[in-house]
Every structure is written in C-alpha cells, then in structure tokens.
C-alpha cells in the first residue's frame, strides 16, 4: 500500500500540470480538459485523506465535485459550440463579449 505522501505528491503534480495548461494554452477545449484535470487532482486528495483518516466524508464529497464537474463540462461545451458556430474559432483570445 502506498503512503499518503505519494498520493499527495501525485495530486500536486496533476494540479500543477492542470494549472500550467490553463495559463499557457489558448484552445478552449484544452483549457476545459486542464480544469477537469485539476478537479480530478482535488478528488484524488479527498480520496487519499478519506482512506488515511478512515472517514467516508471525503468519498462523498468527491461525488459532489464530480457532479459539478459534469455540469461545468456540459455548459462549457455548449458555450463552445455556440461560439464556434458564431466565430468559427475556439481560441480564447478571439472571445470578446463586447463585440457580439
């Protein structure tokens, strides 16, 4: 069995990769994937602490985070489809809501 530190290090690495992806990338789909990676890193942390402490609250909270992530993905993809139909691009630099 792996120690808690291993899970926390993996979670920190995943969260850092996701943060760098959000800050560096310009494609909206890649940004949404990086946000999902960050949410999964948080879920991994919740599960690791839940297992370490012997408490089920962290595992229950993961279901709430997954529900919010699914709703965020659905709304985000719908907005990207609408934006692509309007502008034929999904670059975040092309998004300017004042010019619609």
Curated annotation (Swiss-Prot):
* Pfam families named among the record's database cross-references: Oxidored_q2 (PF00420)
> What is the membrane topology noted in the UniProt record heading this document?
Multi-pass membrane protein
Catalyzed reaction equations: a quinone + NADH + 5 H(+)(in) = a quinol + NAD(+) + 4 H(+)(out)
**Major place of residence:** membrane
**What InterPro entries does the record tag this protein with?**
NADH_UbQ_OxRdtase_chain4L/K, NUOK/Mnh_C1-like
GO cellular component terms? NADH dehydrogenase complex; plasma membrane
Recorded GO molecular functions are: NADH:ubiquinone reductase (non-electrogenic) activity; quinone binding
Q: What class of enzyme is it?
A: translocase
- How does the annotation summarize its subunit structure? NDH-1 is composed of 14 different subunits. Subunits NuoA, H, J, K, L, M, N constitute the membrane sector of the complex.
**HAMAP family in UniProt:** NDH1_NuoK
According to its UniProt record, which protein family does this protein belong to?
Belongs to the complex I subunit 4L family.
| Record protein name field | NADH-quinone oxidoreductase subunit K 2
Q: Give the gene that encodes this protein.
A: nuoK2
């Amino acid at each position: 069995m792996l120690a808690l530190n291993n899970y926390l290090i993996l979670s920190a690495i995943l969260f850092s990769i996701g943060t760098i992806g959000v800050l560096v990338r310009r494609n909206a789909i890649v940004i949404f994937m990086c946000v999902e990676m960050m949410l999964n890193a948080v879920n991994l942390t919740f599960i690791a602490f839940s297992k370490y402490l012997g408490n089920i609250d962290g595992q229950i909270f993961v279901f709430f985070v997954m529900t919010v992530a699914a709703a965020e993905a659905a709304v985000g993809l719908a907005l990207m489809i609408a934006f692509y139909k309007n502008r034929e691009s999904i670059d975040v630099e092309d998004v300017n809501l004042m010019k619609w």
